[in-house]
UniProtKB/Swiss-Prot annotation:
Family membership: Belongs to the Ycf3 family.
Gene: ycf3-A
Membrane topology category: Peripheral membrane protein
Protein's recorded name: Photosystem I assembly protein Ycf3
Keywords for this protein: Chloroplast, Membrane, Photosynthesis, Plastid, Repeat, Thylakoid, TPR repeat
GO biological process: photosynthesis
Lineage, top ranks: Eukaryota, Viridiplantae, Chlorophyta, Ulvophyceae, Oltmannsiellopsidales
Length: 166
């Protein structure tokens, strides 16, 4: 049974009903409707921490979705799951793919910066100050672009940048 038919709480049920109505009335192909259904089920599974199920749904959505903009969000969400699982290298691959399709995705830029910042912190712990500087520089570049696209969204990043560049 699809996840969308297993929702237990009122908000999820309401969202599912509204989404189903929209999918039925919007002039889209069956393929696009299927892609959206998989994407929606992936988001629901991801929200519940069911990452394996979410990935299965996202990969099915990717198989069906042809619009680059819509694909960017699927790829971004796959990156989020890999980030949550500590697989930062794989997460970066998906964030980069998302940005190739949608360069105006500040949340992907932010998450890339967070990973580089984390790696910079790890390099400091290992006594690799030169490597940490390179990683922090990369983080700064990605945060600057994220902030340029969404100036009010990344206040912690702005604070870090102010300290890092001064």
């Amino acid at each position: 049974m699809p996840r969308s038919q297993r929702n237990d709480n009122f908000i999820d049920k309401t969202f599912t009903v509204v989404a189903d109505i929209l999918v039925k009335v919007l002039p889209t192909s069956n393929r696009e409707k299927q892609a959206f259904t998989y994407y929606r089920d992936g988001m629901a599974a991801q929200a519940e921490g069911e990452y394996a199920e979410a990935l299965q749904n996202y990969y099915q959505a990717l198989r069906l979705e042809i619009d680059p903009y819509d694909r960017s969000y699927i790829l971004y969400n796959i990156g989020l799951i890999y980030t949550c699982n500590g697989e930062h290298g794989r997460a970066l691959e998906y964030y980069y793919q998302a940005l190739e399709r949608n360069p105006s995705l500040p949340q992907a830029l932010n998450n890339i910066a967070v990973i580089y910042h984390y790696r910079g912190e790890q390099a400091i712990e290992r006594g690799q100050s030169e490597i940490s500087k390179l990683l922090f520089d990369k983080a700064a570049d990605y945060w600057k672009e994220a902030i340029r696209l969404a100036p009010t969204n990344y206040l912690e990043a702005q604070s870090w940048l102010n300290q890092y560049t001064n």
